[in-house]
From Swiss-Prot:
It is found in: Cytoplasmic vesicle, Autophagosome membrane; Vacuole membrane; Cytoplasm, Cytoskeleton. It is a lipid-anchor. PANTHER family: MICROTUBULE-ASSOCIATED PROTEINS 1A/1B LIGHT CHAIN 3-RELATED. This is Autophagy-related protein 8c. Interacts with ATG4. Interacts with NBR1. The gene is ATG8C. It comes from Arabidopsis thaliana. Belongs to the ATG8 family. Ubiquitin-like modifier involved in autophagosomes formation. May mediate the delivery of the autophagosomes to the vacuole via the microtubule cytoskeleton. A lipid is attached at residue 117 (Phosphatidylethanolamine amidated glycine). Keywords: Autophagy, Cytoplasm, Cytoplasmic vesicle, Cytoskeleton, Lipoprotein, Membrane, Microtubule, Protein transport, Transport, Ubl conjugation pathway, Vacuole.
Length: 119
């Protein structure tokens, strides 16, 4: 996820300050950045930054992403963390603890196909 446009648009120090401010104000929430994978055929998401309840599952968050991009029911969507498909039943808090970036955000990429081939 090195090509994150969010990372390119905002310097590391500003991202660190923002994520720690968010975590202090909302300790039961996870700061997540969601971006579409390059060369993906699914629509772009209308907003990249999410404050996700810590007890939400990955599957529930994928449902939120589907609704935001208005993806039809017959189309598949895959959400990746560090180029890996996280377990659908995993809690977002566990995914955050294991995969958060040095700036304090969890970066997720979505695609209409299993672009990385890792399950």
């Amino acid at each position: 996820m090195a090509n994150s446009s969010f990372k390119l648009e905002h310097p590391l120090e500003r991202r660190q300050i923002e994520s720690s401010r968010i975590r202090e104000k909302y300790p039961d929430r996870i700061p997540v950045i969601v971006e579409r994978a390059e060369r993906s055929d699914v629509p772009n998401i209308d907003k990249k930054k999410y404050l996700v309840p810590a007890d939400l599952t990955v599957g529930q968050f994928v449902y939120v992403v589907r609704k935001r991009i208005k993806l039809s029911a017959e189309k598949a969507i895959f959400v990746f963390v560090k180029n890996t498909l996280p377990p659908t039943a995993a809690m977002m808090s566990a995914i955050y603890d294991e995969n958060k970036d040095e700036d304090g955000f969890l970066y997720m990429t979505y695609s209409g196909e299993n672009t990385f081939g890792l399950v």
